[in-house]
Structure formats: structure tokens, C-alpha cells
Design a protein with these regions (language model features):
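Extended HEAT/HEAT-like alpha-solenoid repeat tracts in very large eukaryotic scaffold/adaptor proteins
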Residues: 158-166
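A glycine-rich, hydrophobic loop/mini-helix early in the fold
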Residues: 122-136
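Acidic, Ser/Thr/Gly/Pro-rich intrinsically disordered interaction regions
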Residues: 1-113, 117, 121, 138-157, ...
Length: 341
């Protein structure tokens, strides 16, 4: 019988998820967390020692648990943790902010994946709901009474949960910036995003591109944040309502929408916005926001000797099963120093 400390190989056989895609890579975070990235899912490896640290049962086996049904083939995974884990390992020494940085990047990626799952829960029901609504209306259009339309299940829970996790993601993005810049963040003002951007403009002029990018993103950042606040603290000028499928004049129907009035804090008031479209837009914005923060902050933190630079892969070199876009390598300037004179 194989001993628990022997080298071993592992095959993922998850009874709850039929995912025959390949294991793309396994990554560790500070020797405390081992992650298995398949094309379409992510697992956490639980070694025998983590299950039985006192080694009281020598036959204790290794196991694993599912983290996400989104894997390395998704930009939400490849373009965040997998991309920047390689860059961070290459350019940061162990006695730097590296351990904390890796923890924060993975935590943010987990939040992004949670939001992606909430969005997917809604979006993946839409085709079926539309077909059912069309059938109900078609079969009953000659009648004066149309039965209730098909609904998106768990709509309100998933939509509101997206906003709750989404706002925390935004706060944690600025905590990530603080790790690089010492941006002051208090418990009472951690969501004062405009204040944080102003501080960066005044105190970190070398990060001008980051401040500019954050300023351009401020509108949607505050809108998401205030939509979340409208859930927790509703009132005049701070409200959000969610509506599932709805019948309209002429026997037409609409997919789920939400309406919000955020005029108590920002000049935003919208009606009947398709929820799935706005969540998709938020997800993409969140991906690009986090990627930009990491690119700008890491670029500013590269060794002063100019040894490394960050480059972008040619489109043809980006792999569909793990579409990493950026990488770190020796800079052209450093290469020139290596050439014999």
C-alpha cells in the first residue's frame, strides 16, 4: 500500500460535475494552499497531512474539493491569478510583499468567480425561460386569460448577491492598491472611492496612469456600490427594485429587469435595465479594473536595475485553454548589458 508521504498523482473524479477537460496547471500559495486548475473548473487539494496533521491514521488519503465551475479557459481565471502568479513569482523576492500579494490576488479572483457564478445562474436560464414564455403566449393568445409566465429562478437572490460581493470586490481592489502605496483606508471610509483616487493623485504621482484609469472607472464603480447600498439601506433617492419576466401590452414579454434611484448620493436613476446585460458589463469592468491595477502597480514596483519588463503576448500566441495576455521577462535594456562589448 502506498504511504501517505510518497509522491502521488491525482485524477479529478467529481460526481457532481462531469468535467473531462484537462488539468492545465497546479499552483501553490505560500505553501499553504494547493490549487488544481482544469480548463473548466478549479479544485483545492487537501493533502493527508491537512486532514490528519497529527498523523494518527497512516492510511488517511489525499482528497480535493471543488472551488469553482469556471476554469483556466476563462479570462476571469487566466487573466488574474494564473497570469499574475507567474509575474509575481518572477519579479518579487520572498522577503517582500509577495506572500500578502498572492493571498490578496487569489481572494479577489475568488470574489470575481463568485460574481461570475451569480451572473451565470441568471444568464443560463434565459433561453429556456424565453422559449417557455413564447409557448405560453402562443398557445393562449386567442384566450382572454394568459397563464403566468415562466420565471428566472432565484433571480432576486442572485442579483442582490452579485452586488453585495461586487462592492466588497471593489473595496478589496483598493486594499490591494494600499499594499503597494500605503493608501490610508479606514473602516468608515473604505468605500469612499473618489477620496482614494484623489489621495493617489496627490501622493503617488508616479502612478498617474493608474489614477487616470480609476477616475475613468469611477462612474460604474460608484453605481455598483450605491446599488448595493440601496439594498441594505433603502430610502428616498436610494432604492432598487427587481422585476422578473413580465407581460406587456400586445402580449409581449420582457426578461428580468431592475430599476434604481441613486440620486441621494449620485445623479443616477434608471428604469427597466436588463439585469443580465448589466451584470455582464460589471463583470468585464471588474476584470479589467483588477488587471489594470496589478499591471500598473507591479510595473511601478519592478526592480530598479531595470532587469524585468512586462510584455503582452501576440494574439496568435494566446492559448485558448489558458488565455494569459501578459508576462514578465528580461528587459531589452538588461539584455543589452549582457552582450559582450
Amino acid at each position: 500500500m502506498q504511504k501517505r508521504d510518497d509522491a502521488f498523482s491525482i485524477t479529478i473524479n467529481d460526481p457532481d460535475l462531469i468535467d473531462e477537460s484537462a488539468i492545465i496547471v497546479m499552483e501553490t500559495i505560500n505553501d499553504a494552499l494547493l490549487l488544481i486548475f482544469k480548463e473548466n473548473s478549479i479544485y483545492r487539494l487537501l493533502t493527508a497531512d491537512s486532514t490528519d496533521p497529527q498523523k494518527t491514521q497512516p492510511d488517511t488519503g489525499h482528497t480535493y474539493e471543488k472551488i469553482a465551475t469556471i476554469g483556466a479557459a476563462s479570462p476571469y481565471v487566466a487573466r488574474i491569478f494564473l497570469q499574475f502568479k507567474r509575474i509575481i513569482d518572477q519579479v518579487f523576492p520572498e522577503d517582500s510583499i509577495k506572500p500578502k500579494l498572492l493571498e490578496q490576488v487569489w481572494s479577489l479572483n475568488e470574489q470575481l468567480l463568485v460574481c461570475a457564478q451569480f451572473e451565470s445562474n441568471i444568464r443560463e436560464q434565459l433561453d429556456d425561460v424565453m422559449q417557455k414564455c413564447d409557448t405560453i403566449i402562443e398557445q393562449n393568445k386567442s384566450s382572454r386569460a394568459i397563464p403566468p409566465l415562466a420565471k428566472v429562478k432565484n433571480l432576486e437572490s442572485d442579483a442582490k448577491s452579485f452586488l453585495l460581493v461586487g462592492k466588497q470586490f471593489l473595496i478589496d481592489c483598493f486594499k490591494l492598491i494600499s499594499l503597494f502605496t500605503d493608501l490610508p483606508l479606514g473602516a468608515r471610509d473604505e468605500a469612499h472611492f473618489d477620496k482614494h483616487i484623489k489621495w493617489l493623485q496627490q501622493n503617488r504621482p508616479t502612478l498617474k496612469k493608474l489614477s487616470s484609469a480609476l477616475g475613468n472607472d469611477l462612474f460604474w464603480i460608484r453605481r455598483l456600490s450605491e446599488c448595493r447600498n440601496a439594498i441594505e439601506h433603502p430610502g428616498p433617492g436610494q432604492s432598487l427594485t427587481i422585476e422578473n419576466t413580465k407581460l406587456h401590452p400586445g402580449n409581449k414579454f420582457s426578461l428580468p429587469t431592475w430599476s434604481y434611484d441613486l440620486t441621494n448620493k449620485i445623479n443616477v436613476k434608471e428604469s427597466s435595465i436588463p439585469i443580465h446585460q448589466e451584470l455582464d458589463a460589471y463583470l468585464n469592468n471588474m476584470l479589467y479594473l483588477l488587471e489594470e491595477i496589478l499591471l500598473f502597480c507591479i510595473s511601478e514596483s519592478l526592480p530598479a536595475d531595470g532587469m524585468f519588463s512586462i510584455y503582452q503576448h501576440n494574439e496568435a500566441d494566446i492559448k485558448p485553454n489558458c488565455p494569459i495576455k501578459y508576462y514578465a521577462s528580461l528587459s531589452a535594456k538588461f539584455y543589452s548589458r549582457l552582450k559582450p562589448s
